[in-house]
């Protein structure tokens, strides 16, 4: 189980990403459309002025059951341990143990 503070930090990051998503996208569109280097520099400074945690790359996928950051399957949002446990218990519809 991950520390509660780490899980809370990730929740805070997700809120910041959601809050600044439109502003960040509009600034990035302006930046890509600008031809003048000075104009690009000015827009880049505005982007840098946004909170660091509002960048989507800083959000880490975590298991929703345990909060673990590693070995998380995107399709389920579960870490490998929880995926195995829940699949064996039949809690994941459509997931069956393979045999050949």
Swiss-Prot record:
It holds the Pfam family Ribosomal_S14. GO terms for molecular function: rRNA binding; structural constituent of ribosome. GO terms for cellular component: cytoplasm; small ribosomal subunit. Keywords: Ribonucleoprotein, Ribosomal protein, RNA-binding, rRNA-binding. PROSITE patterns: RIBOSOMAL_S14. It comes from the Bacteria. One of its GO terms (biological process) is translation. Gene3D superfamilies: 1.10.287.1480. SUPFAM superfamilies: Glucocorticoid receptor-like (DNA-binding domain) (SSF57716). Part of the 30S ribosomal subunit. Contacts proteins S3 and S10. PANTHER family: 30S RIBOSOMAL PROTEIN S14, SMALL RIBOSOMAL SUBUNIT PROTEIN US14M. HAMAP family: Ribosomal_uS14_1. Belongs to the universal ribosomal protein uS14 family. Binds 16S rRNA, required for the assembly of 30S particles and may also be responsible for determining the conformation of the 16S rRNA at the A site. This is Small ribosomal subunit protein uS14. The gene is rpsN.
